[in-house]
Amino acid sequence: MKDFSFEKVKMWIKQELVLTIALLLGCVSSFFNTPKMHYIDWDVLAVLWALMVVVAGLKTVKFLDWTAIELLNRCATYKQVVIALVGLTFVSSMFVTNDVALLTFVPLALVIGKTIKMDMPRVVILQTLAANLGSMFTPPGNPQNLFLYAHYGYSALGFFKVMLLPTVLSVIYIGVIIYFKRNHPLQLELPALEKPDRKLTTIYLVLLALNVGAVLHLLDKYIALAITAIVVLVVNRKLVKQVDYSLLLTFIGFFVFIGNISNTSVVSYLRDHVLGTTEGTYLAALVSSQFISNVPAAMLLAGLTREADALLLGVNIGGLGTLIASMASVISYKLFAAEHPYQAGGYLRMFLFYNFVGLVLIGFVTYLACIVNYINYLDVSQFRELSEFLNW
C-alpha cells in the first residue's frame, strides 16, 4: 500500500512539476524571510480565475468546435483547410489562451487527418506555433502576459505597441511556411455539431468580454469577478470545478518566492549588473524560457528587473525553441503522440527545427528593431539632456 501511495505521489509530481517547484521555492525561501500577504497579487489571481471559469463555460457549449466545423466544411482546397485550422488557433488563442486553443483545435485536426491525407506533424506544429505566437498579442492570451500586464501597470495601448511587431513577424513566418505547401482540391464533410445553446453562448461571450475589459482596466476587476461568479453559480456551478487551480497555486508559490528573495544581496547584484539593461533582460528571458518555461521565467525575472518591455518580448518569443519553452507545446505534443506514437520522434525533430528557426528570425529582428533602437533612443535622449545642462 505504501509503494502504491509513493507511486501516486511520484506521478502527481511528474504531472505537476512546475507547481511542485513553485511551492518548494516558496516554502524553502520562507525559512529565510517571513512571507507577507502583500507578496501575492490578488488582482492577477482574480482575473485569471474569472477567465478560466468563463472559458470552461465556452468549452461546455462547444462554441469553438461548432465555429471551426462550420468554417472547415466551406474549405475547397487542402491549403484552405490548413489555413483555417492554423488561423482559428492563432486568433482564438488571443482570447481563450494558447492552452485552450490547442486543446480545442489539435484534436479536431487529428480527426480530420483520419478522413483526408494530411501532413499531420507539420499541421499540429503550425497550430502550436500559432497558439504560442498569437497569444502573445493580448494580455489575456497567456498567463505570463496577464501577470506582466498587471505587474508593470501597462496600458492597453502601451502593451499592444510593444507586441505588434513580433506578432506581425509571426504571421509572416507562419504564412511563408503554409505558402510553400503543396495544394490540391478537396471537399471536407465533417459531421455537423448541434448548434450551441444561444442563451448560454451569449452569456459566456458577454462574461468573456467583461473580463477582458477588466484586464484592460475598463472595468474594476473585482466587480467583473463578482458578476462572473454569481452568473456561473446560477447557470452552471460545475464550471467552478473545471478551473485549473494548480495554475493559481503555481502563481502563489512564485509570488511568495519572489517576495521573499526580493531584497537579498544576490538579487540586488542580478538586478544591477545582469538584468539592469534592456539587452540583458531580453536575452535572459529568451534563454531562461528554454529551460524552465516562459511562465516561470516571467514571474522570476519580473522581480529582478524594471525592463518591462524587454522582459515581455523575451518571454513571449522565448516560448519558441525547446518543447518545454511553452507548456502549451507539451500539450500539443502529447495529443499528437497519443494518436501517432510511431511518429513522435519525427514530430519532435520537425518541431525543434521550425521553433528554433522562428526563435532566431523573430527574436533577432525584434532585437534589432525594438531592443537596439530603444537603447539608441535612450543614448540620444541622455546626450540631449547633457547638452541642455551644459548649455544652461
Feature names for model-found ranges:
Residues F4-F31, D41-V53, T202-L210, L218-L233, ...:
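Hydrophobic mid-bilayer segments of alpha-helices in multi-pass membrane transport proteins
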Residues F4-F6, I69, F180-L205, R237-K241:
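Flexible interhelical linker loops that connect adjacent transmembrane helices
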Residues K8-K14, P35-V44, A156-L165, E194-D197, ...:
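Interfacial loop-to-helix junctions that mark the boundaries of transmembrane helices
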Residues Y39, A56, V61, D65-L71, ...:
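Transmembrane helical segments that form the transport core of multi-pass membrane transport proteins
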Residues D43-V44, N73-V86, T115-V123, R198-I203, ...:
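Membrane-interfacial loop-to-helix junctions in multi-pass transporters
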Residues G87, V91-M136, M299-L313, P341-Q343, ...:
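Hydrophobic transmembrane alpha-helices that form the pore/transport pathway of multi-pass ion
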Residues K117-M120, V124-N183, L188-L193, K334-F364:
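Membrane-core helix-loop-helix motifs of multi-pass transport proteins
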Residues F160-I174, L283-D379:
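C-terminal transmembrane helix pair
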